[in-house]
A protein has these predicted regions:
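Extracellular acidic, Ser/Thr/Pro-rich low-complexity tracts
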Residues: 12-17, 27-38, 47-51, 119-121
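Solvent-exposed loop/turn segments flanking beta-strands in beta-repeat/beta-sandwich domains
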Residues: 32-45, 52-61, 67
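Aromatic sugar-binding surface patches on proteins
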Residues: 70-102
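Exposed beta-strand face motif in extracellular beta-rich ectodomains
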Residues: 25, 109-115
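Short, compositionally biased P/S/T/A/G/V-rich stretches that sit at domain boundaries
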Residues: 1-23, 135-144
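Beta-sandwich strand segments
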Residues: 123-133
Length: 144
């Protein structure tokens, strides 16, 4: 059996902070496998910047987790934001870094993105992809 992505939930529009703060946008995907949830190896997405015709994060997968938010993914205490472990809903809190960060790698790019989701099971079989389009807006209040 092949894994399935039943649904994907993410904002359609994200306003990037204008200062040096960071906000977190929760992304979820409900996955199903006829062999059971234990047969799902991973759920995740890649982020494609439409205007730049390029993948962000070096094209690497951004993993979603079905861990109930109990596992620290990055120190000191960053968790997935997943609500309930082992319920088939995989989650990740995507960091959105403000324009005021002096390190360019900590400034979230603005523009149109296709978030391309898929799931893979334990036999390395892939689900069909689901594409979610999101707009990251420049949120600079100094122009108002």
């Amino acid at each position: 059996f092949i894994p399935q992505l039943v649904s994907v939930s993410a904002s359609d529009t994200i306003s990037r902070p204008s200062d040096n703060s960071v906000i977190f946008e929760l992304v979820t995907a409900r996955a199903h496998d006829a062999n059971g949830l234990n047969d799902i190896r991973r759920v995740g997405f890649v982020s494609y910047h439409v205007e730049w015709d390029s993948f962000l994060n070096k094209g690497n997968l951004i993993n979603l987790y079905d861990d109930g938010g109990e596992v620290v993914i990055y120190e000191p205490n960053f968790t997935s934001g997943d609500l309930n472990a082992n319920d088939g809903i995989f989650s990740f809190r995507v960091p959105v870094f403000g324009a005021g960060n002096t390190d360019p790698s900590l400034q979230t790019k603005t523009g149109t993105f296709n978030w391309i989701f898929d799931a893979m099971d334990m036999s390395n079989t892939y689900s069909d992809t689901v594409i979610h389009r999101v707009i990251v807006e420049w949120n600079d209040l100094s122009y108002i």
